[in-house]
Each structure stands twice: as structure tokens, then as C-alpha cells.
């Protein structure tokens, strides 16, 4: 189901490049120059949409950045229902779980929502494109 959703989505977006799978089996979506997007299905058949925002630089007030992220997470208002946090490498990431049985239209809306919120958080946290790579 996920593979079909992904293929239809990238075709709709006009992406000509071949879909990539990363080391953990997630699809890498080549739809943004600012945010690295990945999509996978978990053991519960939920779809996990992840947007990697990058490392919070040491020059930044880390406590202030973490507090801002916690405020944004509260009730999901500033994250579109996604969760904003840190991965095991200390990089900021925005993650949204959605039902595995989702329509193509809803899937596209979820991807768009995560991407839009991720780009807003890049600006809010002051992370640049260089920090995404």
C-alpha cells in the first residue's frame, strides 16, 4: 500500500528521479531542497513521515531552542499534529504518524502539512540549508 501511495505521490509532483530507499527501508522523497523527507511503514502498519531539520548549532542558545520546540509541540498546534524532537544524533526532526489505510489525497495532504511545518520550523529555529546536509 505504501509503495503505491509513494509512487502516485511522486508522479503527481512530477518527480522524475528514481525513488531511493535508505538504510532502514524508508523512502526518501526528493521534493524539497530545504528538508530531507522520509516515509516508512512501522510494525503497526502506520505510515511514519519524517522531516529532518538538521543539527542545532552549538552557537545557538540550546536551552532556548529546546524550550521553543517544547512550546511548539504542546497540543500539536505549531506542528500540524506532528511531534518535534531530536533523533539519536541530536538532529531536530519533525515526525507524523498516520493511519496505514489512507487515501491518496489524504496522504498527499499529510506530506504537504509535514513539509510546510518543517520549513516553518527551519526558519523559527534559524537552521540553514547548509545544516541539512
Curated annotation (Swiss-Prot):
<dbReference type="InterPro" id="IPR010261">
    <property type="entry name" value="Tir_chaperone"/>
</dbReference>
<comment type="similarity">
    <text>Belongs to the chlamydial CPn_0713/CT_663/TC_0034 family.</text>
</comment>
<protein>
    <recommendedName>
        <fullName>Uncharacterized protein TC_0034</fullName>
    </recommendedName>
</protein>
<dbReference type="GO" id="GO:0030254">
    <property type="term" value="P:protein secretion by the type III secretion system"/>
</dbReference>
<dbReference type="Pfam" id="PF05932">
    <property type="entry name" value="CesT"/>
</dbReference>
